[in-house]
């Protein structure tokens, strides 16, 4: 198999550092890594009946469940031309089984996904990791059902470790009940229930009043336990803060840079985040909180 590099060179990806390539600053260096992925891949999927030719996706791990994916096309002479690449981190477990909508990006054969989860309160938009697998399945069965299991994960360029908010068991139990009731109200409101809408409005007003009073004397991070909200103008980037349920560290097999994998509970959603240890301020421990900006990725399971 032959391969050619990107026409006009290759751009640096801003989240390469999250998977242990923080010192990659030259295009020639990332081109070598891309060639390494194509030639010594861990996983390869080829779509031969693609409208534009033969589409191929190569993935290689450079750490624990994290690495680089390269996508492109073969020409009639079996020469592979990379179109784009991206760093990935595959999370653990199933984050949600809500209905997911997938749409192709305009400029290349990559995809974005959108999912409404009542626990977050906003539409989650993520970058689809397994584009080739999605293309395979959609060609097999036409329109895919909307309830595919979804695993979300995040790559972080920077983050901080915060102390936890002190809570007693009764307060935790009461908060879970309130969250459960609120999710039922949101579901009802989406179906046009006016009483549910009014109840949610009153709850929001009470919350605003409570925060307005406490913000005078308390720090905002002691009032807000966790959050998950859009960040900047790129639709798949989020500012998150959540409790650390588990963590582990490992090294990039090429650079030796230490990477930290954190399992977070954020607004009752559990997902994993990957960050270069040099970009994280503080020492992670179970029960503490992580606060940072993430690029949200998702993997659909078939």
Please provide the spans of the model-predicted regions.
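Eukaryotic intrinsically disordered and solvent-exposed regulatory patches
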Residues: 229, 248-250, 278
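OB-fold (S1/OB) nucleic-acid-binding surfaces
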Residues: 245-273
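Short nucleic-acid-contacting surface segments enriched for D/E, G, S/T with interspersed K/R
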Residues: 277-292
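Short, Lys/Arg- and Gly-enriched loop/turn segments at beta-strand edges
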Residues: 295-302
